[in-house]
Amino acid sequence: RERIPDLTGRAPWARLDFDAIEIFNGDDAVSVAAVESVMKDWYAFLDAGYRITATGNSDSHRAIFHEPGLPRTYVKVPSDDVSKLDQRAFIESLRKNRAIVSSGPFVTLRIDEAFIGDSVAPGLRRARVEVSAPRWMDISFVEIVQKGKSVARIEAPFEPMALTAELEAMLDLRPGDWVIAIAGGTKEMDPLYRRGVPPYAFTNPIFVEADRRPVNP
C-alpha cells in the first residue's frame, strides 16, 4: 500500500525499488507472443537504465495442469553441488542479472569475455550464443537482441540429433545498450509436457557501460 505524502497529496508515479520481475509465467507457456509482450515492458525498464532481472516460473498450483519447472529460472552460482548452495550468493547473483529463463533449451551469451550480467565498454565486440537442448527438442532459431532490436539471427533446421546450436556476430555497441540472447522452436514438446507448449528461452542482459543514471520517472 502506497502512502500519499501529506503536503502534495500525490503518490509517486511508480515504485522501482525492486530487483526482479516475472516475465515468463507457466500460464503463457503455450503462447510465445504473450511472453514477448511482457518482454517489451522489461525492455522499457532496461532502456531507462534500470537493471531489473527477468525471471520465469511455472506458477504450479496443480500438478495435473501446470507441470512444476516449466518455465524455470537458472541462476549462476559458484557450485553445482546443491549441498554447497550459498543462499546469499544465490540472491546476489540474481540481483546482478546472472540468470536465464527457459521452458526447455539452455542458452548462454558472451560478449568477448563478459558473461550474462556483466558490463562491457562500448565499441565493436564479438557476441557468442550457445544453445544446448535434448535431441527430441525443436530448436529452430537463435537470435541476438541489442536494445530491443534483433541484430543477428539464424534459423533451422539444425542438424538432426544435434545437441547444440551456436551464433556469433560482431556488434557495434553504444553507451547504454544492452544485449540478450533468445532461442526457441515451433514444435510443441508433447507428450513430455502438456500439449501446445513450444521451447523458448532467453538470457538476462550483458550491459554496455554508460556515464549516466537511470531515468527518473
Model-predicted regions and their roles:
Residues 39-43, 47-53, 58-217:
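C-terminal functional module detector
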Residues 1-52:
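Catalytic cores of extracellular degradative/oxidative enzymes
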